[in-house]
Structures are given as C-alpha cells and as structure tokens.
C-alpha cells in the first residue's frame, strides 16, 4: 500500500507522529533524520507489525496548503470558518482556533468548495491542487510566513507497507533491494513534486489567486494551542508516546520548543 500515513490515525494513533503535525518538525531533512538516525523507522515497523504489515519506509511528498473562498489574514479570522482538514490532531488544533472542521474524502473537496458547502480546505501542495482545479473555486491560498510556509502539515509523508506474510516470503536480498529502492524513490518523488510546484505558482497568479501569508505572531498563537494537543495524542498508546518522546527531544535540541512552552506538560 502507498497511502498518506496520517489517514491511519483513527485506527493507529501513532501515525499522527509518523508524518508532520502542526508546528512540530517541519522540514523533510528533519523527518529523514528522525526516521533513519533517531529510531523512527523501528517505531513505525513495530506499530505496523501489529496490524500484519511491514512498514518499508516513508515517502517524502510535499507541504499542504489551504485553499479558501474568503480571505484569512490573521489567526482570529479562522473563527467560524468551515474548513475541511484530515481529522485527528490537525482537526483538533483548528477547532481550538475556532474553526468548524469537516471530514471529507479527497474526491469531495473540490465540489464542496465549488458549492460553498465549506469555506476552505486543506489539501496537498500547489502543483497537485492546481491540476485539480482548486484555483477555479477558491481565490485565496493561506500559508504561514516564509520560514513556516505550512503551519499545519509542512511535510506530508506517505509510506510503503506490505502484507507481513508476503514480506517474510521474500528472499533477504530482495527485501534489502526493495527497502533501498523505496528510500531512493522517496527523494526522486519529492524532487519531482517541488519542480512541479515552481511551475504552478505563476499559474495561480495568472488565475487571480491571492497568496496570503500569516504572521509570525499568528504562528505563535497556533503553537500555544498545538503543544497541549501534541501531548494529548502522545498519550493515546505506547507507540505514540515513544515516537513523540523522541521527536520532542529532537525539537528541544534544535530550539523548536522551550521549557517555558512545555511547563506543566508531561508524558
């Protein structure tokens, strides 16, 4: 299988920590470091093994952006906005900001925006969304400041998983080659998406779409909401706790969170 990992979160809470989440690790290289140098891959494989699956590896994809029918220029403007998000931790953070969150399958997002059933929608990145026609039904794209371009899902990871019995039946040499191929494909795929994004941005401008950048102060307001929700989700099962504890130490080490922000919170 090759899904977006976080869509398992209803069944496997740990998957909320196997892809990016609001104001956490926000660069592809950080996720690469966590998976391949800080134990993330082992955590993912243990968790998926309990579902009868072998987690081959993550696949880098893109950041997610928000398309909106109305201008959202500051944190407070999210209040009352009916927004489609993928659920889980992300939905809870937007709800805490006052938005009305909606779950919709991918195929229903465009028509929901077109008909005004929703005001805004998280979806994938610029190139994919342009090809799907989002510029036709939403004249605003909402992003964070340049250093935090996606406040809610900056590194939307996919994964490759295989039925465990099928995996075990493969020769060791073939398993090793397949793991290496997935790792290489991850970055080939990512690079292709980034090239397509560069080509998509001028098309949005030509279509009259305005890109709105939230401020650093808006990001700080979202962060204050997000951090307690991180801890809530981390307590949902043993793998969530293990994954987040590791990521939290990483974030502390690179200055993403401070002791003051974590005051009163524990795993």
PLM feature segments, named:
Residues 1-31, 39-267:
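N-terminal secretory/targeting leader peptides
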């Amino acid at each position: 299988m090759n899904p977006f990992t976080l869509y398992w979160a209803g069944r496997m809470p740990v998957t909320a920590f196997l892809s990016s989440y609001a104001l956490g690790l926000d660069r592809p290289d950080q996720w690469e470091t966590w998976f391949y140098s800080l134990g993330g891959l082992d955590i993912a494989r243990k968790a998926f093994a309990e579902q009868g699956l072998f987690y081959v590896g993550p696949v880098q994809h893109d950041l997610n952006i928000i398309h909106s029918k109305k201008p959202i220029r500051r944190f407070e403007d999210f209040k009352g906005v009916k927004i489609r998000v993928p659920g889980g931790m992300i939905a809870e953070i937007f709800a805490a900001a006052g938005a009305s969150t909606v779950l919709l399958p991918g195929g229903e997002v465009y028509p929901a925006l077109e008909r005004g059933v929703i005001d805004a929608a998280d979806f994938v990145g610029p190139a994919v969304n342009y090809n799907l026609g989002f510029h036709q039904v939403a004249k605003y794209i909402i992003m964070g400041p340049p250093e935090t371009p996606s406040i809610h899902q900056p590194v939307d990871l996919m994964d490759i998983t295989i039925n465990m019995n099928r995996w075990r039946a493969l020769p060791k040499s073939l398993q090793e080659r397949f793991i290496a191929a997935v790792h290489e494909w991850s970055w080939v795929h990512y690079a292709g998406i980034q090239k397509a994004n560069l080509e998509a941005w001028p098309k949005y401008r030509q279509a009259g779409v305005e890109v709105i950048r939230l401020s650093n102060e808006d990001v700080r307001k979202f962060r204050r909401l997000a951090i307690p929700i991180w801890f809530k989700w981390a307590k949902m099962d043993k793998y969530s706790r293990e994954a987040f504890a590791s990521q939290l130490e990483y974030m502390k080490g690179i200055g993403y969170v401070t002791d003051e922000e974590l005051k009163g919170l524990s795993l």
